[in-house]
From Swiss-Prot:
This is Myosuppressin. Signal peptide: none annotated. GO terms for biological process: neuropeptide signaling pathway. It is found in: Secreted. The modification Phenylalanine amide is found at F10. Belongs to the myosuppressin family. Myoinhibiting neuropeptide. It comes from the Eukaryota. The modification Pyrrolidone carboxylic acid is found at Q1. One of its GO terms (cellular component) is extracellular region. Keywords: Amidation, Neuropeptide, Pyrrolidone carboxylic acid, Secreted. The lineage of its organism: Eukaryota, Metazoa, Ecdysozoa, Arthropoda, Hexapoda.
């Protein structure tokens, strides 16, 4: 899922 990566991106 991209949701997990979205938080890391921030």
């Amino acid at each position: 899922q991209d949701v997990d990566h979205v938080f890391l991106r921030f």
